[in-house]
Regions:
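Conserved glycine-rich acetyl-CoA-binding loop
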Residues: 86, 90-104, 108-113, 117, ...
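Accessory recognition modules or surfaces
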Residues: 100, 153-162
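Conserved catalytic-core motifs of GNAT/GCN5-like acyltransferases
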Residues: 119-121, 134, 139-157
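Alpha-helical elements of the RecA-like P-loop NTPase motor core of helicases
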Residues: 20, 37, 130-131, 149
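Short acidic/glycine-enriched loop/turn segments that link adjacent beta-strands
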Residues: 46-47, 80, 126, 148-154
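Acetyl-CoA-dependent GNAT
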Residues: 2-9, 13-94, 103-113, 161-165
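Acidic, amphipathic alpha-helical patches
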Residues: 39, 129, 144
Length: 166
């Protein structure tokens, strides 16, 4: 059966059976990746959400054959604040708007849940991520020295205030 990719992507919550594919992306994206156990714990917490961006694959006959995970985003919702913990895109899907799609969906869900603030930390050296967050109107508000203890790198603390439109 021939399989071809559809040009659109979808977002859904991660399930336990997605873990192997998500771990492949995590290992490809980071020098010091999270462990599978950390992902399992995030799946168990009520306040934690792991969104995955999937690329549906169709058969030559036009039916849905399977899906491939293109990226993921992990966030916590605590009271009226969303904290983004981890964002990664599969190297084969980079520069295709996957992270932007995940960020937009996270913000939509944050607003729907009544959140008023979004926060995150990012490596000072991660220029691509800093640019992405700035396009979403995040602003730097501080530095956490040696936050990334693996290499002694500082984290830039960024925030975005959410405004509801009525």
């Amino acid at each position: 059966m021939a399989v071809r990719a559809r040009p659109r992507f979808e977002i859904r919550r991660m399930r336990a059976d997605d873990l192997d594919e998500v771990m492949e992306i995590e290992r490809a994206a980071f020098r010091h990746p999270w462990s599978a156990e950390l992902f399992r714990r995030e799946l168990e917490h009520d306040w934690s959400t792991i969104l995955i961006c999937i690329e549906p694959l169709t058969s030559a006959a036009g039916g849905r054959a399977s899906e491939r995970i293109a990226g993921f985003l992990i966030y916590w919702l605590v009271h009226d604040e969303v904290h983004i913990l981890n964002v990664a895109t599969d190297p084969q899907h980079r520069r295709r708007g996957i992270a932007k799609f995940l960020m937009s969906e996270t913000e939509r869900r944050a607003l729907q849940a009544g959140a008023t603030l979004m926060t995150l930390e990012v490596r000072r050296s991660n220029v691509a991520a800093l640019e992405l967050y700035r396009t979403f109107d995040y602003r730097a508000v501080g530095v956490r020295p040696n936050y990334y203890v693996d290499e002694g790198e500082d984290a830039i603390v960024m925030v975005k205030e959410l405004r509801r439109f009525r």
